Every structure is written in structure tokens, then in C-alpha cells.
Amino acid sequence: MTDAQMADFGAARYLRKSEKERLEAQTRPFDIRTECFVPDDKEEYVKAKIVSREGGKVTAETENGKTVTVKEDQVMQQNPPKFDKIEDMAMLTFLHEPAVLYNLKERYAAWMIYTYSGLFCVTVNPYKWLPVYNAEVVAAYRGKKRSEAPPHIFSISDNAYQYMLTDRENQSILITGESGAGKTVNTKRVIQYFASIAAIGDRSKKDNPNANKGTLEDQIIQANPALEAFGNAKTVRNDNSSRFGKFIRIHFGATGKLASADIETYLLEKSRVIFQLKAERNYHIFYQILSNKKPELLDMLLVTNNPYDYAFVSQGEVSVASIDDSEELLATDSAFDVLGFTAEEKAGVYKLTGAIMHYGNMKFKQKQREEQAEPDGTEDADKSAYLMGLNSADLLKGLCHPRVKVGNEYVTKGQSVQQVYYSIGALAKSVYEKMFNWMVTRINATLETKQPRQYFIGVLDIAGFEIFDFNSFEQLCINFTNEKLQQFFNHHMFVLEQEEYKKEGIEWEFIDFGMDLQACIDLIEKPMGIMSILEEECMFPKATDMTFKAKLYDNHLGKSNNFQKPRNVKGKQEAHFSLVHYAGTVDYNILGWLEKNKDPLNETVVGLYQKSSLKLMATLFSTYASADTGDSGKGKGGKKKGSSFQTVSALHRENLNKLMTNLRTTHPHFVRCIIPNERKAPGVMDNPLVMHQLRCNGVLEGIRICRKGFPNRILYGDFRQRYRILNPAAIPEGQFIDSGKGAEKLLGSLDIDHNQYKFGHTKVFFKAGLLGLLEEMRDERLSRIITRIQAQARGQLMRIEFKKMVERRDALLVIQWNIRAFMGVKNWPWMKLYFKIKPLLKSAETEKEMANMKEEFGRVKDALEKSEARRKELEEKMVSLLQEKNDLQLQVQAEQDNLADAEERCDQLIKNKIQLEAKVKEMTERLEDEEEMNAELTAKKRKLEDECSELKKDIDDLELTLAKVEKEKHATENKVKNLTEEMAGLDEIIAKLTKEKKALQEAHQQALDDLQAEEDKVNTLTKSKVKLEQQVDDLEGSLEQEKKVRMDLERAKRKLEGDLKLTQESIMDLENDKLQLEEKLKKKEFDISQQNSKIEDEQALALQLQKKLKENQARIEELEEELEAERTARAKVEKLRSDLTRELEEISERLEEAGGATSVQIEMNKKREAEFQKMRRDLEEATLQHEATAAALRKKHADSVAELGEQIDNLQRVKQKLEKEKSEFKLELDDVTSHMEQIIKAKANLEKVSRTLEDQANEYRVKLEEAQRSLNDFTTQRAKLQTENGELARQLEEKEALIWQLTRGKLSYTQQMEDLKRQLEEEGKAKNALAHALQSARHDCDLLREQYEEEMEAKAELQRVLSKANSEVAQWRTKYETDAIQRTEELEEAKKKLAQRLQDAEEAVEAVNAKCSSLEKTKHRLQNEIEDLMVDVERSNAAAAALDKKQRNFDKILAEWKQKYEESQSELESSQKEARSLSTELFKLKNAYEESLEHLETFKRENKNLQEEISDLTEQLGEGGKNVHELEKIRKQLEVEKLELQSALEEAEASLEHEEGKILRAQLEFNQIKAEIERKLAEKDEEMEQAKRNHLRVVDSLQTSLDAETRSRNEALRVKKKMEGDLNEMEIQLSQANRIASEAQKHLKNAQAHLKDTQLQLDDAVRANDDLKENIAIVERRNTLLQAELEELRAVVEQTERSRKLAEQELIETSERVQLLHSQNTSLINQKKKMDADLSQLQTEVEEAVQECRNAEEKAKKAITDAAMMAEELKKEQDTSAHLERMKKNMEQTIKDLQHRLDEAEQIALKGGKKQLQKLEARVRELENELEAEQKRNAESVKGMRKSERRIKELTYQTEEDKKNLVRLQDLVDKLQLKVKAYKRQAEEAEEQANTNLSKFRKVQHELDEAEERADIAESQVNKLRAKSRDIGAKQKMHDEE
């Protein structure tokens, strides 16, 4: 979008980058290889440039000039400049945390606060007003697609609105974030946008009959101020923080016009009503009322305008700078009016708010000598009761003495002061919460209109994830809500992403990311989750928070990964459990959760609330029902009880589930709000704070999910247009190619990873980073093309310029030629005549042209007039047509509206029709099914009736079979009993196995302990070895250690100084606090003194008044004496009255108890009532008499009494006022004294803390002084040692100067020096690492001191040696100097002697030092080190072998126990399964047996019937053919019976055929199962063969590698022997010189050797430790593999078990299939034999493979030991080279010194002549030649060492590979063994099954034989009957013929 198009948005620069910025970003230089982000402690990440990469580490220079070195995986690439301030962060090429952070930061710096992040929008709070919400911006965003406009909350809103209209689907906008992030403001903007566009669309129809209420748009907007007044408050982060969540649904009609709205609220923070933190305040409404903007409110609520007068609202701050409470009150009141609240409703809301303020001022005190509470003043109670419409006395009574139901009776319970205050707080919170909920309901009623509504858009404004230092029940509810919303967010986002892949036809395996958080959600909400356990605990009366915690731990600790035990840190709040949420781990404190969840109320006071005269109060608590009232109710009463006692957690879960249900029915849009900083400073972004929110809000998670697939996508046309430049030949210009195919060709022709992109139907999809690579390639291509174009353009320009120059030259030549020709003819007469005639010819031509032009003008004029007339006609026509067009447009618009409505109705009707058709179809199908079922049931009924008639006949026969069945029952019971006994035995086996498992675990733990002990022993041995070797450590090592000690001490000193500074600062802070408290204390004391003086003045005034009061009392007493008689009389009457009343009450109580049942009691009651009436009359008479007397006395003393009464009233008022003031002062004094006590306590605590801090500071000072002293001691010792070292070094240099004089070989030495320097640096690093390890190991002070003393002794010994050498050197020097001074005159002789001595010394040095420095030291060192290292290697190898042996034994034991456990487990499972299968088989066999018995009985009955019929027939035949008619009847009967028998036979044959079909099917299935099992066995055999071949190949490769290693080892040994021979020869030549020359260097060399030995031993120990760890890891991997294999085998066993069960079920269906079982058994037996043979073969093969593995393992161990020896030899060679390097450095220094001395000697010996000088120079040249030869030999030895080192590395690598192969072979062998065991188990199970089936087969075969015999008998009888019937028929036929 261009800048001109962006101008429509009004505030363009706050929404999108300008074109200029985009161009500058694209042209800015950028190197993608060096520009990066690196981590930073303060800023999270900073931009940097990579300087170098080395060894997995990167050195980079940050943008602020700082150089840092970090690991390579911590460096993250920057995106190219074209992605700066990108509007959608999902399009970033390199998407990671720093890229997201810096994109947000750069946009925020440019005030672009909205940014897309994939499918959602991120907004950052600007903390200032931006012009991006006005009407111009609203209009600009209306109807724009997301891609057409910059990111904005209006764009999200408009997209939701357009989706709603086009997709016909409800929408939702989820706005989340922390408090102060701008959620409420963005919610307002969304509502403003919808109200605006709805108002634009429906402005003509806004006619509301109630003008005061306002339009629906106004009401929706005004709902916010009303809810904010009662639901928003100032917090630490936000001055207008919403303390509740809300879901606002805005309903629209079918055409998108606003219809209605409603609001749902969640989690109102009730606790804020009675408690606020210091920097916070209560809800805004309290301070708005107290702002005195509406004085009538203060009068109505009986409050002042001072918030500090009310405890509930003055615990924190009472005013906010950014909020004008008085103006907000007017806005709230106006919002009530717009929302249609009546005056009574408004007054009720204000009264309840004021009553809550008075509630907080109610005071209670403890009764004397009791724990019960009583009111301490009733003024505030009276006010609150008045405002709530209650009786004050009843309210106080209900608070102090509530009625509690105990059993079936009510008991009055006394409350303590603390309980009363808790009850008041709970009631205040409940009143406020219910009032707030009522307001929401009332607003919803106002926003509910009768207009039709089709869809809605919901806006969710809810608190974000909260992780505080103290997290309670509220945080759990909020975090649980966010967990559910995040799950919904993940699911929705990635489902959309994957749907696009599906729509585009990309191959994609669907992944459900929504279940990522299900474990945590289930932990909270599922049965026996946290919420469930909390609700369960709330049901128990004795439950506490600790029982709740114990249940949580029992159910979830160790069972759920999301539930953890927290680590409590000192200084922080205690935490009881931790939950792993998606945003981080949160520690929760459960104190008070049960009370919070139950939220109990004082039911006595609630009962008063229900009877309140204030209508709103009664309405709020009308639905509340207590536990006792709910018990007796039925129907609706029961529901009320359940709802009123619903816990807070259950209610929250119910609301949350409703919310999630609503959200799932909508299309969601997500907005994440971010706080940029805690200081509310505009334009400043705190990186760590923002990163924390991005993680908690799921922004990074959302981008990760969005990017997991193919985040970058481009339409084919756009891709082809932009990237065709990369390879134009791939898409030829002349011919047409489809964009998709063109993109495919183009990408295929590029040199990129072709797995990084996919082709969809309309787009090409890219993985992350590939698009950036294409951009880089495009930029390079463009730069090359532009360079070429520039070159061509410059060439073309120069060619054009050259052409112009040529043309100018040609033109000049032509002009010159013409001028010359003109000059030649200008005076010619004919030419002059031509000049004169030429103009005349032109004038004639012009006249002709003028005439033609006039004619043309006339024609044009006529045409113009015609066209003008025509234009006027057309204009008239156009006007009429425009009018018609407008009319038609109006008609079309109306028709379109009607058509839209008709289409909607049509769609609705079609949907209804489809639904009805589906219902009709379903009903017809159901009807058909019912008819079929009815027909079947009718047939069954008929059949059953027939069977019933037959069964009635068979009852007698069945009785006979009962006995047999009983016997079988007893047999089966015996079998069941045996099975139960077997089960008991199996249970015992299980118990034994569990015990063995425990023992195994204990043995495992013991083995681990032993392993740890062995490691400790190794560590102690290593430490002792280090300690022993440190005793002979050299001077250089000790100095380095002392330097490190000093550095550590300096570090400790700095740390202590920092701690001291911090401590001093904290002490200063405490002292400042102490001073402030003392000042406050002084102020309070001054106030107290003032109050005391006031009290004294008041007391004096009270004394004066008391005097006057006494005088008046004296006068009153005189008058009272006259009234005394009357009083006594009245007292008697009153006493009599009270006695009668008491008797009456007693009588009435007795009457109530007795029930007035008897007539005697009735008569007594009547008598007593008569007496009572008489006494009442007497009393009334006495009262009248008394009143008359009193009236007379009053009249007598009226004047005096009136005066005294007035005085007394005045005095009483004064007294009451004084007492009130006194009580107030007393309360204030109590508060002040309590405050003073608190201050004194705090002061004492602070003094205690300060004393402890001072003690700590003193201890730190003492420690610091000790450290300083030790540091000073170390410094002095170091200086001393340095001086001694310097002296020693100087002496050594002087000694060596005599040996290595005049050596010059720098040029040939430089290359070797560099190599040796690198080796030295590596050795130095290793040395530093060793020193660091030693330092970290020095945890014991005594050990350090001992080591230090031993080192000092070694140093003293060295010092003595050095001092001796020094003395000798000094003697030589003094002697030499004295000789030189004394014999100056004999200079020539001295020079000769000196030359002779030098020559002798040089000869000695030539014989000694050349070979000494090169080989003798090497030989000694190698021998010593080889001996020591061989001892160490043998020791470590022995230890490693012992540990390895233990490990192997342990592995074997573990494997055996595991095998036993698995076998027993499998046996148990198989036995259980077999028991179950046997029971099912028993049941089925029983059923089959019963069926066979039934068949047998039917056959018997049929036989019996036939026999009876035969006997009847024979009897009839015996009687003779008495009657032909009777015989005819008999014949017909027999024919009928014959037909019945034939039908029965046919049915029997059909059933036999059916059973035979079943048998055939079972045979087929069994054959299939058999083929499957054989196929699996064949596959297993092939796998075994393949594994065997692999093993053989691996063993062969191991054998070849071992042979190569053996050959290389032999070669190395040969080289070593040769070197040892050379060394022996050199030793003989140099032994004597060695003793003279290397006396002082042996200590240094021995110390270095010991240091290297120590390092090698430490490396060996580390390697051994690593090997042990690797072995443990291998064991664990083996365990996991065994477990996995076990699971696989279990699955296979279960699968085979299922198939076996199916086969058995089919097998037992009929008795005829028994024969098939027999064949199966035989085949199984054959298979078992085959499997046994295979198993034995496999076992032999496995044993052979195991043996081969063992042999290979032994060979590998040998190779490892050989490699270790070679590595040790290499290490020795390295040590030798390092020593040579040091010797070389010393020699170079000596050469320098000798050169200096030689120069001095040359100056001294200038007079000595040139001959001596020439001799010395010749000698120097010889020495140089020898040195070069020595250097060559040294270089050759270094080359040999490097070769051996490379060989050792190769061998080491080969041995590691062999180890891995061995491990793999071992794992494979273990798997094969397990498989063999599994096959064995399967074979045994198959054999057992075959035996059981065989026994069953035999049993059933026997029964079948019996049944067949019975069937044969029956068949023979039937045949006989048939023959008889045929005979009878023949006879009958013959009889008929006769």
C-alpha cells in the first residue's frame, strides 16, 4: 500500500512504515553471515557482529562496542533489513526469541503498537494517547481484508464482522494479558467499532420510545463505565485494573445490524472489598461516592467525604492522579440512566455500597471473663442496618450470637471477636459480589431487545497468566482458565494451519497440538484431581489445609509429571505444591483454601437479609438457602440447596466449561496485550519483562506452532513474477506456461534443498529460512544484472555521445561547403533575380491556402452547430436516463433486500426440509425395522407356543436329568474350588515376587551404594596421590598456585567487600527506617500530649458540671423523698405483677408441656385465668391510683421539676457529648498505644536485626582482616620467593652461560618455536584445568595448610640448594672480578687464560650439553615416566577390571532377577487368562452339554411317542378291521404323522448341513491362523539368520581391526626398542657430563614429571569415571530395550491370545467340530516339536554368537589396553617436547645474556688483538653448526612423535567403534535370548492348550459316540416304524382292492 493510499487512514505513521523507510531498509548493507543476536544478562539479547569462530565458540562484537565469546548454539542470525518492523512476525525468515523481541521493540519505538504474529495480534501498551482510534480510522478499516490494511484492533474486529456475515458463523475475540497491558482499553475499542459500524448501517431506524434510555449502541458503550466503577480498582501496575473477567456477546441480525448484547463475568476479586495493599485501593465506586460531587448521596448514605473515616476503603491509597473521581461519579450515574436503571434501583445500589463502608467501622470487644464478643458502640451498626433495611439490634445479635442447627434443634452460639470480624468481612464480600452480579443481570436485561438476532461476536477480556511470589487459590483458578484457553488457542491455530495444507493438497500427517496441555488440565479438573480433592475435603467437617495437602501428595506426587514438591527458599513465602503450567512452574500456598472454597456465611444474618425492607437486598439473597432449610424441602427446595452450597471451585469450573463451550461454537480471533515496562513510561521497553510475557501469553508458542509446517507461502503468479530472475531460462518468454508448472520448473532448476518446499493447488509453501535464502540469491542476481546494465548503459551513452560528435563534425563540413558555394554565387545576376522572385511565388500559395481555410472554417462551424444541438438533446436524454437509473437502482436495492431475506428464508426452509426429510427417512427406516421385528417376534411367538406345548410334555423327562446335572454341578464346583485354590497359590507367588522385587531393589540400591563407595575410594586415593606428589612440586608450580590462591583471595575479598557494602547499605536503610519511625513516634507522642491536654480541659469542665449536677441532685433528692412512698407502693404492685406474670408463664409452660389434655387442667386453667383477671384489675386500679397521686405531686412541683429537668437534660447532653469524645479519644489513644507497641516491637526487631547484622559485619571484618593478613603473608612470601627465584634463575643462567655461550640459531628455530608454543599453550591449558580442579577439591582448610607446609619445606630445600649455588657463583664472580682488577697490568696473560678456559669449557660443553639437552634428559624422563605410568596403568586397569567385573556381576544378577520377575509375571498373566478361558469354556461346554441333553430328550420323547403309537396301532390291528371307517381315519392320521416325520427329518438334515458349513468355515479360519503363525515363524527365522550374518560380519571386521592394531603395536614396540638402544648408547657417552651440568635442573624436571604424572592419573581417574558412567548408561539402555522388548512380546502374546480365544469360541460352538480340534491338536504337537527343534538350534547359534562376542570383547579390551599404553607413550613424548621447549627458552635467554657479556668482553679486550677474536668467532660458528644439527635431530623426533600420535588417535577411534559394535552385539544377543524364552513360553502354552483341548476332545468324543449310538437306535426304530407303516399301507391297499 502506497503512502497516498495510507493517507486515508489519517494516522498513517503510527500504523505502517513509509515508502522511504522501506526503500532505505532494502538498500541498507547487510551481511547475513556476520549479523547476529547474542544473549545478554540485562537486555536478554543484543545485536552483534561475528568476528571469529573457533572450536564451537563464537567471538562477536556487540552494537555497543563490547566483545563477547559465546557458544555457537547461543548465537542467532538476524533477519535481512527488508524484514525490519515487519507487520506479521510469522513471515520472518529466522524466527526465534530475539527476532520477535526486536521486531516488537522497533515497532514500539516507532509507535506502531499493533503487530500480527501468525493468526493473532500482539499489542503493546503505549502509555499515551495515539490518534489511531478516531472516526477516520474506523471508516478506513471498514470492509478491508487483513492483508489490505496495517495491523490494528479494528482490523481484527472488521475481519470478525465480515467472517460472521460471509461464513454465517459466530465469532469471538479473545483479549488476554497481564494487568495493565491494555485489555480493557482494547475491549472498549472493539465495542466502539461494532457500535460505530452498526450505527452506520442502521441510523435511519433508531427510534426508541424511551428517550432517557438512549439507543442500543449507547447502552452497549455505557455498560463499560457502570461495570468499571464497581469492578475496576487501582493496583500496583495499573490505575484502572479490571478485577474481573468478562465475555461480552454482541448479537447481530441476519443483515449485520446490531440486535442486542449480553455480558458474562468471571472471578470477581471479592477480597479487595475488605482488604487492599498499601499501593492499591478499593473499587472506584467508593471513592466516587466520597468525592462530594453529589452531596445528596452523602446525606442519603450517612457518610462523610473523608475516605480515612472508613476502614474498608482506606487501607491503601485513596486517590489516583490519573482518575477524577467526581467526574467518574457523574459518568457512572449517567450510565445508570442510559442503561434504564430506575431511581429505586440506583438508590438501592448506592445504599448497599454505603452500608459496606459502615460495616468496616463496626467495633466489637470481648466480654469480661468470657471469650464471647459484644458490640463496642452501635452507631455504625445502626447506620448500616438503616441502609440495608434491617433492625440494628437483630443485626448485632445475629453477628454476636448466631443460631446454629444441632441435630433437629437450633442453638444460640457465642462468637469470639475474631469470628465476628471474619463474619462481617464474609458478609460484606458476599453483598458486594451479589450486587455486582445483579447489576450484570440488570444490564443484560436492558441490552436484551425483541429484535431478531442471528449471530453474535463475543469479546473475552480476562486476566492473563499469574506467577507471583505468593500464589493462592485465586491464582490457581486464573492459571487454570488460561491453561484451558491456551489449549483452545493451540488447537485452533494449528488446526487452521493444517486445514490450509489439506485444502492445498499437501501431503501432511495431521497432528493434534491441542492435547499438549491436557495432562495439566486433567490434573486440575478430572476426578481425583486438585479441584475434586478440594471439594471432597470441603465436605468433611474435620478437614484442614494439611489434610488437603496430604491427599494431594498421596494421589499425585510421583504419579503426575505436572505435580511437584516445591523447594522452599528462605525469605520467600512457603509453598506447599508446584504445578508445571505451559508458562512455567508455579508454587502454590494452600493456606485458607478450604474456607475460600466453602465461602461460609452467617446464616442468621442472611436470614435477616432475606427479610430486609430494602427491595434490592431481599432480591439479592432470595435464592440463598441454608443447609438446614434444604434438608426438609423437596423438589425445588432440593435444587436450591445444591445451588447455594456449590463450592467456589465447582462454580468456576461450571462457568469455565460454559465459556469453553461458547468459544468452541465460534471462530476465534486472538489478541495478546503486552506491558512494555513497570514504570508506565511511554516508548520504553523492558526486554526481560516483555520476554516473560511473550512466554506466558503463548506468543512464542503460537509462532512455533504456526512455523512447524510451512510458514512462508506465495501464490504461484507472485512467485513466478518475483523470482523468475533467478533462472529466466527455466520459464521461456515466448511460450505460455502455467504459473504452477513454471514455479515448479524454476525451483527445480535452483541449487537449493528440494525437501524444504511443497507445491499446493494455488501456492508454493516454504520451510523456515528458505525464503530468506531465495531473497539473498535474488539480491545477488540483481546486483550482477544491475552492474551489467550500468556497464552497458555507460557504453551506450558514450557511443551516443561519439555519434553526436561525428554528426556535428559532418554537419560542420556541409555548412562550410555550402557557405563557400554561396560566397561563390551570391554576386551572380541570375541568383539576384531568383532572390527577388522567390517571395512572390510564396504569396500566391498563401492566398490559395487562406481560401481553403475559410471553406474549411465554414464547414466546421456548421458541424459544430449540429453537434451542439445534438449534445443538448443527448444531455436531456441523459438526465432522464439518470433519473430512471436511480429509480431502478432503488428498486434493485429493495429487490435485493427482499431477495436476501427470501434467500435466508429459503435456506432456512431448505435446511428444515432436509432435516425433516432425514427425520422422515429415519422414521420410515425405524418403521420398517419395527415391522420386521414385529414379524420376527410373531414368528418367534408361534414357534415358542409350539415349543411350549412340547415342553409341557417334556417336564417329566427333564426331572430325570436333574440328578445328572446336579452331579455335574458338584464336579464343576470341585473344579472351581481347585481353581480358587490355584488362584490363592498364585496370589502367594505374587506376594513372594513382590518381596523378591523389593529385595532386588534393595540389592540394586546396595550395589549403587557400593559403586559410590568405590568411587569415593578412588577419589580419596587420587587426593592422597595428589597430596604426595605435591610434596615434591617445583617452584614454578607453587608460584602459580599461590597466584591462584591470591586471585581467589582477592575475589573473596571483593565479594566480602561487596557483601559488606550491601550489609552497610541495608544497615543504613534500617537506620533511616528507624529514624523515620522515631520521628513518627515523636509526632504521635506530641499528638498524644495534645490529646491529653484536651482531655484534662474536658475533665475540668466535667468537674464543674458535676458540681452543678450535685447541687441539682440535692434538690432532686428532696423531691424524690416525697415520691419514695409512691415508689414503694408501685414497687409492691410491680413485684406482685411480676410474680403473677411469672406464675402465668409457668402455668402456660406447663400447659404447653401437658398439652391441656385433661378436663381438670382446663378447669384449673380457668380458675387461674379468673384469678389472673382479678389481679390484673387490682393492678390496673392500683396503677390508676398511683398515677393520680403522681400527677398531683407532679402538678405540685411542676415548675421546679421543669427547671431542674431542663438543666439535667442540658447536663446529660453535655455529659453524653463528653463521654462520646472521651470514648473516641480513648479509642484513638488505644490505637496510638497499639501503634506505639507495634513501633516499639518493630524497633526492637530492627535493633535485633541490626545487632545481628553488626555481628555479621564484625565477623566479616574479622574474616576480612584474617584474609587480608593471609593475603599479605602470601604477598610477602611471593615477593620473597620471586626474589629468590630471580636470583636462582640468574645464577642458573650464569651457570648455563658458561655452557651455551655464543649460540645463534634464531632463524632456523622459528618454525619449531611456533609448533612448540602451540603445544605449550595446550599443556598450559591442561595445567590450568588441573590447577582449577585441585583448587575446587581443596574444600578442607587443614588439607590446604598441610599442603602449604609441605610446599614450603620443598621450597626451603630448593632455597638451600640455590643459596649454596649462589654462594659458589658469588665466590667465582668475586674471584673473577678481583683477579680482573688486580691483574689489569697482566691483561694479555689474563686474556689468554680466559680464552684457554673458554675453549676448555666449550669443548666440555660440546661433549656434554649437545647430547645432554637433546637425548639424555629424554631417556631418563621416558624411563621414569614409563615405570611410574606402567604402575599407575596396572593399578587403574586392575581397579577398572574389578569395577567392570562387579558391574557385570551386578548386571547378571539384575538380568536374572528381571528375567525371574518377567517369567513369573508372564506365568501369572497366562494362568489368569487360562483360568478365565477355562471358565468360559466350562460355561460353553455346559451350555453345549445342556443342548445335547435337550436334543437327547427330544429324541427320547419322539421315540416314546412313536412306540406308544406303534403299540396303539398293534392293539388296533389285533382287534381286527372292525370298522373300515375307523381304519380310514387311522390311515389319514398315519399319513399326517408321516408327513410330520418327513419334515422333521428334513429339518434335521438342514441343521446338519448348517453345522457342517460352520465346521468348514472354522477349518478355513484355523488354516489361515496356522498359515499366519508359520509365516511369522519364517520371518523370525530370517531375522535370526540376518542377525547371525551381521554378527559374523562385525566379528570379521573386529578381527581385521585387531590384527591391524596388533601389527601397529608390534611396529611401535620395535621403534621403542630401537629408541631405547639409542638412548643406552647416549647414556654411556653422556653420563659423566650429566652429573656435572644438570645438578640444579633435576629438581625442576622431577617436579614437572610429577605434575604430568598427576595430570595423567587424574585423566585416568576421569576416564575411569566416564567409563563407569557409560557402563551405567549402557545398563539403563539395556533395561529400556528389555522393557520395550517385553512390551512387544506382551502385545504379541495378547494378540495371539485374542486369536486363540476366537478360534476356541468357534471351536466350541457345536459338538460336531470336536473332530477338527483333534486335527488341530495333532498339528500343534507337530509344530511344538518343530519349534523345540528350532529353539534348540537357535540356542546353539545364540551360544556360539555369545562366545564369539566374548572373544571379540576380550580382543577389544586388549586393543584398548594397547591403545592406552600408546597414548601414555605419546603423552611422554609430548612432555619431552615441552621440556625441550623450556630448555630452548632458557638457552635463548642465556644466549642473550652471553651475547651481552661477550660485547662487554669485546670492549674490554679491544686491545687484545684480532687473533683471539677470530678464534672466538670460529668457535661460535662451530657451535652454531652443532646447534643446527641438534635442531634437525629434534625436528625429526617431533615428526616421529606426531606420527605416533596420529596412529594412537586412529587406534583409539577404532577401539571406540569396536566397543560400540560389541554393545550392539550384546544387545542383539539379549534380544535373541528374550525371543527364545518367549518362543519357549509360547510352545509350552500351546502344549498346555493342546493337552486341555485333547482332554475336552476326548470327553466330547465320548459324549458324541453316546449320542450317535442313541441316534442309531432312534433311526433303526424310525426305519422299523416306516416299514410297519408301509406294511400297513400295503395291507390297507389290498383291503381296499378287495
Swiss-Prot record:
Positions of post-translational Phosphotyrosine modification: 1260, 1309
Region spans: Actin-binding: 656-678, 758-772
A GO biological-process term: cardiac muscle hypertrophy in response to stress
Keyword Lipid metabolism in annotation: no
Keyword annotations: Actin-binding, ATP-binding, Calmodulin-binding, Coiled coil, Cytoplasm, Methylation, Motor protein, Muscle protein, Myosin, Nucleotide-binding, Phosphoprotein, Thick filament
IQ domain boundaries: 782-811
GO cellular component: cytoplasm; muscle myosin complex; myofibril; myosin complex; myosin filament; myosin II complex; stress fiber; Z disc
Coiled-coil stretches: 842-1938
Domain (Myosin motor): residue spans on this chain: 84-779
Domain (Myosin N-terminal SH3-like): residue spans on this chain: 31-80
In-chain residues carrying the UniProt-annotated modification Phosphoserine: 416, 1089, 1138, 1270, 1308, 1511
GO molecular function annotations of the record: actin filament binding; ATP binding; calcium-dependent ATPase activity; calmodulin binding; identical protein binding; microfilament motor activity; protein kinase binding; protein-containing complex binding
Modified residues (Phosphothreonine): 378, 1276, 1283, 1310, 1514, 1680
Function: Muscle contraction.
Anything else known: The cardiac alpha isoform is a 'fast' ATPase myosin, while the beta isoform is a 'slow' ATPase.
Record's comment describing the protein's domains: The rodlike tail sequence is highly repetitive, showing cycles of a 28-residue repeat pattern composed of 4 heptapeptides, characteristic for alpha-helical coiled coils.
Family: Belongs to the TRAFAC class myosin-kinesin ATPase superfamily. Myosin family.
PANTHER family documented for this protein: MYOSIN HEAVY CHAIN, NON-MUSCLE, MYOSIN-6
Protein name per UniProt: Myosin-6
Annotated organism of origin: Rattus norvegicus
